[in-house]
């Protein structure tokens, strides 16, 4: 997982020389396995009750994300209340849960040269909550474990905490005068497990012009390993659509998998 984050971080920098690559790698190395673990053990804990869209546990999750960005002095997105939350009402037809209040979380690190062009990193902040609708576990339907919490450590706690670490690394780079050329948007979307609803809401109500959005990299379930590989080669970067979006990104990911 850490290798995946490093390669994503390097891809978002623009390199004009080997020395610039070295500087980018320096900030990439601030991403540590321990910090990822610390975040994930909180974010996927029982306290957050599986982060079901609109539920109390999901509200705790968005507060955790907001507090992280505040503590790291990373600005909120261009929202009316400057509070990191893009609020919405969603009709959750899956599971007949009705209408709920929920929110995307949006933060930004502004670009140094082309601030009006945007790279968007996304992950979904929600999971399925307690083991009923949307659960693949047969145990969730049997006896006393019917209300089992589904913590969503990989789906998508892994992508969520990865974005936090990437944002922190970019903020440190910016403080040293080595920030990204284009603005980077950190968009944590809600309602993914209910049908990509938070993503659809942002697409219909974009905070930043879609025509100025250069690309979107989505981080989902990146805590897996490749069981066909052995030893220290089991970490594997798998980027869907990279050959369509950027041949350079595709080539870089393939080269990294050979290491």
Model-inferred region functions:
Residues 25, 30-60, 72-76, 85-87, ...:
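N-terminal capping segment at the start of a domain
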Residues 105-107, 121-127, 132-194:
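Alpha-helical metal-binding/catalytic segments enriched in His/Glu/Asp
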Residues 51-109:
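A non-catalytic alpha/beta surface segment that caps or lines the substrate-entry region
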Residues 47-50, 69, 75-76, 92-95, ...:
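Solvent-exposed loop/turn segments at secondary-structure junctions
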Residues 114, 189-259:
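Metal-dependent peptidase/peptidase-like ectodomains
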